[in-house]
Swiss-Prot record:
UniProt-recorded name of the protein: Arginine repressor
Organism expressing this protein natively: Streptococcus pyogenes serotype M3 (strain ATCC BAA-595 / MGAS315)
Xref: InterPro entries: Arg_repress, Arg_repress_C, Arg_repress_C_sf, Arg_repress_DNA-bd, WH-like_DNA-bd_sf, WH_DNA-bd_sf
Gene behind the chain: argR2
Pathway participation: Amino-acid biosynthesis; L-arginine biosynthesis [regulation]
Keyword field: Amino-acid biosynthesis, Arginine biosynthesis, Cytoplasm, DNA-binding, Repressor, Transcription, Transcription regulation
Free-text function comment from the UniProt entry: Regulates arginine biosynthesis genes.
Length: 145
């Protein structure tokens, strides 16, 4: 089996199953008679451009879907360790001393649907225009964790 055929099989597996680890993908391939090393599988996944997302229970899984356009600058995801939502507000958890940096990044993005931010030492409160927007931002930020 050549590289292209193997990558097509991986895509098919990802679309058919809720796969969370490379080991799971490797096991599915082995069941189909395809033996692959961890290094080769890792290169294949990178070439395919799989995304690692979180489901409603917080479990990671691979997805082929294209990333949703985000209103946040790429640096924002670097600082976020955890996201919680309470109605129309988000609570973003960071490392100690990084919440104010994250607040500045979000404020500088000038996102119309964010009314304001309040930063502590390791926690940032983001006030969104409404609950639906908060849900969308929560999903967007959580997908990058």
């Amino acid at each position: 089996m050549n590289k292209m055929e193997r990558q097509q099989q991986i895509k098919r597996i990802i679309q058919a199953e809720h796969i969370g680890t490379q080991e799971d993908i490797k096991n599915h391939l082995q069941k189909e008679g395809i033996v692959v090393t961890q290094a080769t599988l890792s290169r294949d996944l990178r070439a395919i451009g799989l995304l690692k997302l979180r489901d409603e229970q917080g479990k990671l899984y691979y997805s082929l879907s294209e990333p949703v356009a985000t209103p946040f600058s790429p640096e924002v995801r670097f600082y976020v360790l955890k996201v919680d939502r309470a109605g129309f507000m988000l609570v973003l958890h960071t490392n100690l001393g990084e919440a104010d940096v994250l607040a500045n990044l979000i404020d500088n993005d000038a996102i119309e649907d964010i009314l304001g931010t309040i930063a502590g030492a390791d926690t940032l409160l983001v006030i969104c225009r409404d609950e639906e927007i908060a849900k969308r931002f929560e999903k967007d930020l959580a997908a990058g964790l």
